[in-house]
Amino acid sequence: MSDALYESSIQSLPLLGKGKVRDNYAVGDDKLLIVTTDRLSAFDVILGEPIPAKGRVLNQMANFWFKKLAHIVPNHETDVTAESVVAPNEVEQVKGRAVVVKRLKPILVEAVVRGYLAGSGWKDYQATGKVCGIALPAGLQNAQKLPEPIFTPAAKAEMGEHDENISFDEVEARIGKELAAKMRDISIRLYKEAADYAATRGIIIADTKFEFGLDENGTLTLMDEVLTADSSRFWPADSYQVGTNPPSFDKQFVRDWLEAVRIDGKPWPKTAPAPKLPEDVVQKTADKYKEALTRLTGEALQ
């Protein structure tokens, strides 16, 4: 388990905050060091066991997509290396899992795009025939491809709370009509381009979540992580079947285990603390992440 980093401890930079998976440090006034740890969250609860090398997989995958999609929208990348901003004895903590990025003003709306009906989208549809207020054709099945990708935003929740799906009208009310439309259109374009590429690698991107910020000139900028196995639902195309949940390349394996586990005979209530993950679940999840990276990018973990 020596390859796992549950929590970073960078003493040479001011800590700004720790999210579910990432630890953020200030680099001067205009940049951040983002360290992607091996923490795993499911149902908005951080689990107690790290998934070895998961942070490095996510980091490499996000960097791959930032470069691939840079022609669509500016992103937070800089040419400063993580190793150059920390003390020599801290380099091991950042190697392969950290980036130095532009400090942006975050837009507190998660830009979710769905190309398929799955997860909470499928539950919404079963109950109302809609997803996030968007009416869909009748008679769709679980995991079915939608006629066109849809933009289904969510309000960013406080740590430990569940993100809440909101309507596009609500997004307009929060950030203004022009910015809302731009964010929606760019998100759908990013999704379509990524999904078309992934299809050539035998992977379906069922849905994904983008995060944006504004730079000092008010320019919409892609940030955080992009199209990783944490922010997206990846399905292997060869085992895809409408009507059933395909085995995904992401946290679904852990989610399914958590849904099935019983504590004193009762289901886990999806609140902290999380039950301890068995060793085989940890290992299988680590393998899934690495497999997603290799299949999608053609690169091994560096």
Swiss-Prot record:
Keyword flag Metal-binding: no
Catalysed reactions listed for this entry: 5-amino-1-(5-phospho-D-ribosyl)imidazole-4-carboxylate + L-aspartate + ATP = (2S)-2-[5-amino-1-(5-phospho-beta-D-ribosyl)imidazole-4-carboxamido]succinate + ADP + phosphate + 2 H(+)
Pathway annotation: Purine metabolism; IMP biosynthesis via de novo pathway; 5-amino-1-(5-phospho-D-ribosyl)imidazole-4-carboxamide from 5-amino-1-(5-phospho-D-ribosyl)imidazole-4-carboxylate: step 1/2
UniProt cross-references to PROSITE patterns, sorted A to Z: SAICAR_SYNTHETASE_1 (PS01057), SAICAR_SYNTHETASE_2 (PS01058)
Superkingdom of origin organism: Bacteria
Keywords for this protein: ATP-binding, Ligase, Nucleotide-binding, Purine biosynthesis
Record-listed E.C. numbers: 6.3.2.6
Entry annotated with the keyword Nucleotide-binding: yes
Gene3D superfamilies cross-referenced by the UniProt entry: ATP-grasp fold, B domain, Phosphorylase Kinase, domain 1
Identification of the protein by name: Phosphoribosylaminoimidazole-succinocarboxamide synthase
Species this chain originates from: Cupriavidus metallidurans (strain ATCC 43123 / DSM 2839 / NBRC 102507 / CH34) (Ralstonia metallidurans)
